[in-house]
Amino acid sequence: MTRILALSDTHLGREKLPEEVISLAKGADLIIHAGDFVSLNTYESFRKLGKIEAVCGNADSPEIKRLLPEQKVIEVDDIRIGLVHMASHSSDLVGPKMMAREMDVQVLVFGHTHRPIIERGDRLLICPGSPVLPRMSAPSVAMLEIDREKIRGSIITLGSPVCGYLKYANELARESPDGKSEKLIE
């Protein structure tokens, strides 16, 4: 069985990855990231944790955008997996369904919404949510398991409640050029 950790929207600069994400990444055979690392430092942190396949997102740095494509297709154990950041400009799944069909993939992993979604139909659509900056949901990632051409996908809600992640984000306050502290979330 092949285990794939799917993430998106980590939105970290110089901040450290949450320990729970590090642990899940170390236990996976492959990490896939659907964009919005934000910084090259975050991308490099994931590369140190294991094999990674990734695309860039709309909030990524110019360095990331030069390094990574906007979309890609990978094949794992005869399963075609599409990876893209923005699959739609709305909250419905019409865009992701069309994109999965156009990319001719059995699984589409996408980001941008910061909200976890799994839709099982003729294709598996997965948005892992965000492990650090969720929107109207708990912090999350997704785990894909491929076994003999069968694939299962599940959302993993991370241990800290949403309020804990707001606190975590605020502890990662950034210094602005004028020396004043700038909170990531109010």
Where are these regions (language model features)?
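Short amphipathic alpha-helix with an adjacent loop that forms part of the alpha/beta core around
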Residues: P18-L24, E75, P96-R101
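N-terminal active-site segment of His-dependent metallophosphoesterases
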Residues: M1-I52, D60-P69, A138-S140, I146, ...
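Conserved beta-sheet core of the metallophosphoesterase superfamily
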Residues: E53, S91-S154
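Active-site environment of divalent metal-dependent phosphoester hydrolases
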Residues: H11-K16, V38-T42, A59-K65, S88-V94, ...
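Active-site neighborhood of phospho(di)ester-bond hydrolases with catalytic His/Asp-centered motifs
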Residues: A6-S8, L30-D36, E53-N58, L83-H85, ...
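Beta-strand-turn-beta hairpins that frame and shape the catalytic cleft
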Residues: M1-L5, V73-G82, R120-L125, I146-I155
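Short, solvent-exposed aromatic-acidic interface loops
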Residues: S154-Y165
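Helix-adjacent hinge/juxtasegments
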Residues: E53-D92
